[in-house]
A protein has these predicted regions:
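Solvent-exposed, well-ordered amphipathic alpha-helical segments
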Residues: 290-291, 425, 563
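Generic secretory/membrane-interface signal
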Residues: 290, 420-422, 493
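Non-transmembrane, aqueous-exposed alpha-helical and coiled segments at domain scale
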Residues: 1-416, 481, 502, 506
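Feature captures the catalytic cores and cofactor-binding loops of soluble hydro-lyases/lyases
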Residues: 303, 309-383, 438-572
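Short, basic, low-complexity termini and linkers enriched in Ser/Thr/Gly/Pro
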Residues: 406, 410-437, 578
């Protein structure tokens, strides 16, 4: 790859340690993706702000960047939602020690880098945020919304890779930045009428749950959705893309919304009234919720207005109701009198935070009700591990005000015994036994920034993707995800072999925390390039290799003693004979 003078200066450290680390990471990702050039970006959006998600790994990494006085972002960069509303912290009743102080520390560290502290997961709703051209955005809902409805072109960046691009001003030219890779690969035909934004949220999430192992979708499912009205509201479109992003959808097309690239369909799905009602039935609360949360992603002005109208003349007395929004939208809501309506009812209107990144106090929050499948997806995960139900907005408000009560037609939820739900659906795989005798060598590639190495160690193997955020214990390296074939097993100190990571774009910070606590894998081997594992490995020198044949996962099994060796650009791995 030919570098320009600016890029060579960054690589040589002439613009400081932070940009040197960042350009190395960008070049590693470029090489891994077979990108032949770097292209300038117009904007960046960073995930990894709440101590709940970024954790110790994020805080220590930001402290490392702070040691460089030249560390500054090179393009307009916005910040994702934080873990609390600092001004209403006491009202949120967060019991996690030092959470407020750590939140302030993280936001201040980003601000020193020149990041605009918007603390919003909806940058596309801000008037002066660039939503056109090449970009490096993390935060899955923002990626899908921007790619689908605006002129933005961004890959599904991790928090670390987006930060590296923000510091350098460049990103590798590959993936969804190439129009040839933005074609729809799945057709979804909707045969029922959808109206409430929650209907669209359920549709988006449902699409992701249908994914099959046979689908060839290197950049995730990109559905073409037919059968929807041509005049969808902002809130309906937002709910659709936010939930579709739960399972890695970076972009979608609406059939009646203008030109699109030629389709290359892998499958055809039908979503009708039966599917919609089945999801509502499965998601409805079986017992009274402890808390109702609205605004995931953060509520637009239209959503705030809808909540305020539902609350007019009512009092929130039965179940606490929290409405989450951005500081920009809250300011507008104050001017329109909507904020007063919400507060007068007894509900909270919170800013700068989002339901999925709050550490709820389990002594009183035992069951959450929401109108968002994005909130449901993450709140029930290992981040909080709370039973989460879903209903339409009007139903949520009616329960909060006591107009509707939950029928006890099934036993009450018991959170202490509730399993952590899997974010990966219909897994049919398991820890695979060895199927070959003797020694077989597999070949892959390594990161350009890492030199030659030879390691031997115990293998940890699974043929299912690993969701680091929420499903890997940060203190032990143990996978804690019911239904995952490696549930209960630790990666710490082992050569971890798996297809790739999945889930949140904040995942690299979990891997960094494992490294800082000395419970990270000895090395990571992926059959596919992993945008979640590779950035952390690049920055801290954890040996990383990718691009191996899938048969590797069938030949080596957990507990085998293996050797991984890098010579030049090639990495080999083999099972050592007993």
């Amino acid at each position: 790859m030919q570098l320009n003078d600016e890029q060579r200066a960054m690589l040589a450290g002439e613009q400081g340690l932070a940009r040197q680390m960042a350009i190395r990471l960008v070049l590693d990702l470029a090489a891994a993706a077979n990108a032949t050039k770097l292209i300038p970006i117009q904007s960046a959006h960073l995930s990894g702000v709440s101590p709940l998600t970024g954790g110790l790994g994020l805080r220590l990494f930001l402290q490392k960047l702070a040691q460089d006085p030249l560390a500054q972002v090179a393009v307009p960069t916005t910040l994702n939602a934080a873990g609390c509303d600092l001004e209403q912290f006491d009202l949120m009743r967060i019991a996690l020690p030092d959470f407020k102080a750590h939140s302030e520390e993280i936001v201040a560290a980003y601000t020193r880098l020149g990041v605009r502290p918007t603390q919003s997961c909806t940058p596309y709703e801000w008037e002066d945020v660039v939503v056109t051209g090449h970009a490096a955005w993390a935060e899955s809902n923002a990626i899908c919304f921007g790619n689908s409805y605006t002129g933005l072109l961004t890959n599904r960046e991790s928090g670390l890779s987006a930060l590296a691009s923000a510091l350098t001003g460049y990103t590798p030219s590959y993936g969804l930045l190439d129009e040839a890779n933005r074609h729809p690969n799945l057709v979804v035909i909707v045969t029922t009428k959808l109206s409430d934004p929650t209907d669209f949220s359920i549709l988006g999430d449902w699409i992701g749950t249908q994914r099959k192992a046979s689908w060839k979708m290197p950049y995730g499912p990109i559905p073409l959705i037919k059968g929807l009205p041509a005049d969808l509201s902002h809130e309906q479109k937002k709910a659709l893309t936010a939930a579709a992003a739960n399972y890695g959808c970076p972009l979608l097309y609406l059939d009646n919304a203008g030109p699109r690239p030629p389709a290359q369909f892998e499958d055809r799905l039908m979503f009708g009234e039966r599917e919609l009602q089945a999801r509502y039935e499965a998601l409805r609360p079986r017992s009274a919720p402890s808390l109702i949360v609205i605004g995931c992603p953060q509520a637009s002005v239209g959503e705030i207005k809808a909540v305020a109208e539902q609350l007019r003349g009512q009092q929130v007395e039965t179940v606490p109701l929290w409405v989450f929004t951005s500081s920009q939208n809250k300011t507008i809501a104050e001017k329109l009198g909507l904020a007063d309506l919400i507060r007068q009812s007894g509900a909270l209107l919170l800013e700068n935070t989002c339901p999925e990144v709050v550490p709820y106090d389990p002594t009183w929050v035992k069951h959450i009700l929401t109108n968002s499948m994005k909130a449901e997806h993450y709140i029930k995960s290992g981040l909080n591990g709370l039973p989460t139900s879903v209903m339409r907005l009007a139903d949520c408000v009616a329960i909060a005000t006591g107009q509707v009560s939950i029928r006890h037609d099934q036993p009450d939820v018991k959170p202490a015994a509730a399993p952590k739900k899997s974010s990966i659906v219909n897994r049919q795989s398991s820890i695979l036994p060895a199927t070959a005798s003797g020694v077989e060598t597999f070949r892959g590639s390594g990161l350009p920034s890492q030199g030659d190495f030879t390691l031997t160690g115990e293998a940890f193997v699974t043929d299912a993707p690993i969701t680091f955020l929420g499903f890997v214990n940060r203190d032990t390296g143990v996978i804690e995800e019911e239904g995952h074939p490696a549930n209960g097993q630790s990666m710490a100190g082992k050569i971890a072999i798996f297809p790739k990571g999945s889930g949140s774009t904040v995942a690299p910070y979990v891997l960094l925390e494992l490294y800082y606590k000395a419970v990270a894998p000895l090395a990571i081997v992926n059959t596919e390039l992993d945008q979640q594992s590779a950035p952390a490995c690049s920055l801290e020198g954890i040996p990383y290799a990718y691009g191996f044949a899938p048969e590797l996962l069938q030949t080596i099994r957990s507990g085998d003693w293996v050797e991984i060796q890098r010579r030049g650009e090639q990495v080999t791995i083999r099972r050592l004979e007993d």
